[in-house]
Amino acid sequence: MANTPSAKKRAKQAEKRRSHNASLRSMVRTYIKNVVKAIDAKDLAKAQAAFTAAVPVIDRMADKGIIHKNKAARHKSRLSGHIKALSTAAA
């Protein structure tokens, strides 16, 4: 446990940041889940709308370091591929 006042303050700040970052990570997962649900339901319009909403959030979290930039790129690429497959299957 932290003994000095500065260490106590840092521990408090770290806990505050950890919980905030956890909520941001959860938000990203929710946006991704919304896209996946729309894809599973084979609803192209809803999937595209959810993807359009998710991309800026994913990018913002990657810029902030909440998730790694490669993970953000991987999510966007895979979701985009699924939507493209859905659109070609629907056509």
Swiss-Prot record:
The keyword rRNA-binding applies. It holds the Pfam family Ribosomal_S20p. One of its GO terms (cellular component) is small ribosomal subunit. Residues 7-20 have a biased composition (Basic residues). One of its GO terms (biological process) is translation. The keyword Ribosomal protein applies. Keywords: Ribonucleoprotein, Ribosomal protein, RNA-binding, rRNA-binding. InterPro entries: Ribosomal_bS20, Ribosomal_bS20_sf. One of its GO terms (molecular function) is structural constituent of ribosome. It comes from the Bacteria. Residues 1-23 are annotated as: Disordered. Binds directly to 16S ribosomal RNA. Belongs to the bacterial ribosomal protein bS20 family. This is Small ribosomal subunit protein bS20. The gene is rpsT.
